[in-house]
Structures are given as structure tokens and as C-alpha cells.
Amino acid sequence: MRTSPMPAKFRSVRVVVITGSVTAAPVRVSETLRRLIDVSVLAENSGREPADERRGDFSAHTEPYRRELLAHCYRMTGSLHDAEDLVQETLLRAWKAYEGFAGKSSLRTWLHRIATNTCLTALEGRRRRPLPTGLGRPSADPSGELVERREVSWLEPLPDVTDDPADPSTIVGNRESVRLAFVAALQHLSPRQRAVLLLRDVLQWKSAEVADAIGTSTVAVNSLLQRARSQLQTVRPSAADRLSAPDSPEAQDLLARYIAAFEAYDIDRLVELFTAEAIWEMPPYTGWYQGAQAIVTLIHQQCPAYSPGDMRLISLIANGQPAAAMYMRAGDVHLPFQLHVLDMAADRVSHVVAFLDTTLFPKFGLPDSL
């Protein structure tokens, strides 16, 4: 195909190039959608339609909302991996529909509407993502055999999405709304209950707006919301169990002592750091353990560390909570081992979820080895 000579005046506009076909399942979507690339296209200054102009600005207009869209999709799915793919699919759908966006709602609202329906489609027929504490009673013997179930789609942690002061979202970026215990509680709701609760109580939408977004009536929305709130009260953290700021001096001091105890392999010091009723769980293992002594027995008996220096940890924030990435000695280096997300009560650790999925480490910007 021959083209006419290129005009003298050009400018660069950003568009999206799609390669391959798109499938519905997020785990397969990523292979295609991650090939979305920004390219520079030369176009004449004159003769461009307003819709083309707006499409050219799509990336600049939508990029500020990527973080909160990720948080929203994560709350809906309980999976960081799926949330990333669903954000990509949301932006793909939005780009295709951008020409028809009339501005009757804000761009932020419009994007969340698309994201919500994208998540609802992806969640059809899927099981909830649990933590071990959601499967039964605590394990009695921390020295016993550990039961691993990698076929289960476990809840995943989320990197901090509130560290950018330029983020336009102050509601969605609230750390309480991505707290691990809250996201785990959301998994007990149906996808539509989850969507209604998040749109009403986190994003502060009106019932009529929610009804319009998910294609139902206001009466149905209010009914779904009532059932969701009622069910959530039985599984969510209590109102008194407030999340302390992970970057507060108190939280940072306790996290530093927690890291120091592990790196020194100081079991006695670890016992002192946990509350009497502290909980330890580590997906993909199904067991969970309660009580400081049970936890340190588990660490002493089951952890592949034997002496000071076998473990190294990096402090970070996950789900708006203090967290630490643990690396285990492997010859002359330390390799990714676990990602710990902590709950703290006063000056003690009350709950640890230790994720053994090392594919999470790059998502948190962590090094391959130490």
C-alpha cells in the first residue's frame, strides 16, 4: 500500500496499539494487554476531528486515576495480579469508548463504572479468595506437618497505593479501605454485594448512581447494600480495632524490632513482640496458629533458618499496614522467601500474614536477591 508524501507540519499524539486477541479471564488477558504500547503517531495539525483530539489526550487524562483503579479492582477481586490485568482491560474499554464519553459524569466516575463492570464479568463463577483463618479453627500443633494447597486461589497483598501526594483520590486511597482484614472480609460477599458496598461506602456514590452503573434498580441496590453491611459485620475487623499509620514512629519502631529479632534469630525476643492471642498464617499452607508461644514454636521448628544472618528483611508498606519482605540464605546470597503483613496492637504484633508467593516480590519493587 502506497502512501502520499508526508505533510510539512506534524505533531505527536499518544494512541494505544492493540496486538492479539482479548480473552475474558484476567490471568490470560495480561499476556495480551501488557503488549499495549504507547506510540508516537505523526498527524497533520489541521483537519483533525475533536474526537481524535480527545483520544490523543486519553493517556494524560486517565493516568492520574490508575492507582485508585488498581485499589478498586483489588478490593473487588482480592488479587493483585488480577487487579493489574483488570485495570489494563478497564483502560482498554475506556479508550475504545472515549469518543462517546459525553462528560455527563466525571471522568473518575466513568472509569470506576467501567472498572466495576469489568470486575463483575471477571468474577462470574469464581470462588472467593480466602486466607487460612477463613477456612476453620487454628491448628493445634505448630510442630506438626504443614499442609500446602497451591491450587487454592489465595488472597494476595497490595503494595502501598497512597504514597503519591499527587494522587487525586483521597477516599479510595484511604488505607483502611485496602486493609488486609477488610479485603478478606469482602470476599465473604457476593460480587454484586461487594460492588454495591464499595461504590456506596468507599467511593460514596448515591444509590441511584450505583444502580445506573451496574444496571439495576435503586431498590435492588439498597437491598444488596443492607445484606452486604449485615454480613460484613460478622467477619470484618471491629470498629475499635483501628489501623495505626504504618509510618508512625511507634509502628516503625516495632517493625524495626521485629526485623532485628528475625535477623538475629532471637526466639526469646520474638516471643516478647507478639500479643498473647496473636495470629500467624502463611498461605498457601492451610494451618494457622494462635498465641505467641505457638507462633515462635512454629518458626523454630518449621522455618529453614538456623542461625543469625540466615534471614534478612526489608521494611515496606502493604495494604496500608507495616510489612516486611523476608529473604532466606541460599549459599552466598539471600533469596525471596516470604512477605509479612502485620497488624499491631499498642506496642505488640497481633497478626501476621506471611505470603510465600515469591512472584509478589517484583510487584513491590523488591530486589531479586540480597
From Swiss-Prot:
**Organism encoding this protein:** Mycobacterium tuberculosis (strain ATCC 25618 / H37Rv)
Give positions of region: Sigma-70 factor domain-4: 180-232
- GO terms for molecular function, please? DNA binding; sigma factor activity
Write down the CDD domains for this protein, in alphabetical order. Answer: Sigma70_r4 (cd06171)
The record's domain comment reads: The sigma-70 factor domain-2 mediates sequence-specific interaction with the -10 element in promoter DNA, and plays an important role in melting the double-stranded DNA and the formation of the transcription bubble. The sigma-70 factor domain 2 mediates interaction with the RNA polymerase subunits RpoB and RpoC.
Protein name, UniProt field: ECF RNA polymerase sigma factor SigG
The taxonomy runs:
Bacteria, Bacillati, Actinomycetota, Actinomycetes, Mycobacteriales
Kindly give the SUPFAM superfamilies that the UniProt entry links to this protein. NTF2-like, Sigma2 domain of RNA polymerase sigma factors, Sigma3 and sigma4 domains of RNA polymerase sigma factors
Q: How does it assemble?
A: Interacts transiently with the RNA polymerase catalytic core formed by RpoA, RpoB, RpoC and RpoZ (2 alpha, 1 beta, 1 beta' and 1 omega subunit) to form the RNA polymerase holoenzyme that can initiate transcription.
